[in-house]
A protein has these predicted regions:
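Short secondary-structure transition/capping segments
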Residues: 99-102, 202-205, 278-288
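Extended hydrophobic packing segments that form well-structured cores
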Residues: 266-301
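Generic structural "secondary-structure junction" signal
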Residues: 25, 118, 239, 278-279
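Short amphipathic alpha-helical patches
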Residues: 191, 244, 284-288
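Long, repeat-rich segments with strong aromatic
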Residues: 122-239, 246-273
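Aromatic-lined, polymer-binding surfaces characteristic
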Residues: 6-158, 170-193, 202
Length: 301
């Protein structure tokens, strides 16, 4: 799979390839570049250092070309910041202003109790997990040391992420469902991007356990991905939340978009001996609570 990923990057960034992707026309390519850049931050050894020199140059040029896209005043700022962070880690010329602007705005948009506004206002959706908090963490963890003003933000950013991860775990019902609220719910279990990331980083908030989170996320994946109609006859994901529900699609949703659900698989980066994989199956918060078990009260931060 690692080899296939590198081959995909080679084909997608080679201007002479029939598979060359659009990195700068329209607005949506900035989103695609942001997630590609985030992959580079998470697996630089496999997805950057093992690329051939020409592919590295093509990839850098492709990411740089996305700078012509002006991001809206919302979560999209993190796509631009993530692209610049990946360029910095790759040893390319990078734009510190794009990173600083995104970080500063998200500090201003923090609303309390682990939640950021998607822009100045609160939106009841999962974009704190789809985009904002995972990218903010990855940017600060990778590039924060370049600026004391950035580095000092990481502890609070991590504390907020832990709180949001705790809320996410509580949203998972005993049956493995979660509220279908807000836009982009066709990203399915990608709604738990942040919870999966915190498991990968070993930063799950107390009293959550790694095995309990694994059990909860497994229940969600089974409930969503085993639903009839989830995949089309060719094996590709179909637009929907639980099955094929095309009216849930939006103008920016394509077949490729749906694979944001794969972020729930981030703990695959943990070794088999890690407690996330080796621990016995455990009930998660809602399952324990609805069974009548006693437990600690939940509190804001």
């Amino acid at each position: 799979y690692r080899g296939l990923a590198r081959e995909a990057i080679r084909s997608a960034t080679d201007p002479q390839s029939p598979d060359f992707l659009n990195f700068h026309e329209g607005g949506q390519p900035l989103v695609d570049c942001g997630f590609l850049a985030q992959a580079l931050l998470r697996a630089p050894s496999e997805l950057w250092h093992k690329l051939e020199g020409q592919t590295q140059r093509n990839l850098a040029a492709a990411l740089i070309s996305s700078r012509v896209i002006s991001p809206p005043f919302n979560n999209w700022l993190m796509f631009a910041a993530t692209v610049e962070t990946a360029l910095a880690i790759a040893g390319e010329r990078w734009d510190a202003m794009r990173i600083d602007y995104a970080i500063r705005q998200h500090q201003q948009w923090y609303l309390g109790d682990g939640v950021y506004g998607d822009g100045p206002r609160f939106h009841w959706d999962y974009y704190n997990s789809f985009v904002m908090q995972p990218m903010l963490l990855d940017v600060l963890r990778n590039i924060g040391a370049h600026s004391a003003n950035w580095e000092k933000l990481l502890p609070d950013t991590m504390a907020r992420a832990k709180r949001y991860a705790a809320i996410e775990e509580r949203l998972i019902s005993p049956e493995g469902t979660f509220p279908a609220v807000g836009r982009s719910i066709t990203y399915r279990c990608g709604a738990f991007h942040l919870l999966a990331q915190m498991a990968l980083l070993g930063e799950l908030p107390a009293p959550l356990t790694a095995a309990g989170v694994r059990s909860a996320l497994t229940a969600v994946m089974r409930r969503m991905l085993e639903a009839p109609g989830t995949f089309d006859p060719n094996g590709w994901l179909a637009i929907g939340y639980c099955g094929h529900q095309p009216h849930l699609g939006e103008s920016y949703i394509s077949t490729g978009s749906l694979y944001l659900c794969s972020t729930v698989l981030l703990p695959l980066g943990l070794p088999p001996a890690n407690a996330f994989w080796s621990g016995a199956t455990q009930d998660w918060t809602a399952r324990r609570m609805w069974r009548g078990e006693d437990g600690a009260a939940d509190h804001a931060i």
